[in-house]
Amino acid sequence: KGFVDGRSLRLPTVTVRPGKPNKAASSFASGIIREPLSGVEAVCPVDVSTRMWLVSPRTIIGSLIAGYEAPASAFPPSHSVNVPGISVTVREMVDALRRVAGDAVADRVVFRHDPAIDRIVRTWPRDFDAKVGHALGMRTDAGFEAIVRQYVEHDMPR
C-alpha cells in the first residue's frame, strides 16, 4: 500500500574494524590486520585461498548514507540492494598487510584451520552484482591495501 518505504542493504563484511576480537565467524577478517599491527599474533582459521567480499568502515558509512538519501524510485521492486565491496582472498589480505607494514608484522598472522569457522565462511557469497548500489552513489574501496592504510591512518590506536 506504500505506507512504508522499506529498504534492504546487503552489506559486505566490514573490515578492518577497530576494537577487540569477538566470537563472530568474520572476526578474523579484521583480526589478521588489526592484531599484527598492534604487535600481537593473530590466528586465521581459514585457508589463504578463501575469498571474501569486503568493505572498509569509512566506505560502508558512505554507502549507508547513500542508501538512506536515495529516492525510493531509485530502488528496484524488491527494495533490496547489494552494497559494493571488493572480492579478495585471505592471501591478498596478508600480502597487503605485508606491503603496508613489512614482513615482521605480516608474519604475526598464523594459520590454524578451524573447521567450524571455515564451514560458515565458505557459505558466504564471494562477490555480488552491485550495479544498483553504484547507481545510488555507493562507492568501492580502491583495494585491500587502501583499506589497511585507511585503518593505520585513521583508526589504529596510537
Where are these regions (language model features)?
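Mid/C-terminal beta-alpha module of Rossmann-like enzyme folds, strongest
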Residues: P36, P45, I61-D118
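Amphipathic alpha-helical segments that line or abut small-molecule/effector binding pockets
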Residues: R58-E69, E145, R149-V152
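Short, surface-exposed alpha-helical segments at coil->helix boundaries
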Residues: S30, R91-D95, D127
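C-terminal capping/gating helix-and-loop segments adjacent to ligand/active sites or protein-protein/ligand interfaces
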Residues: R119-I120, P125
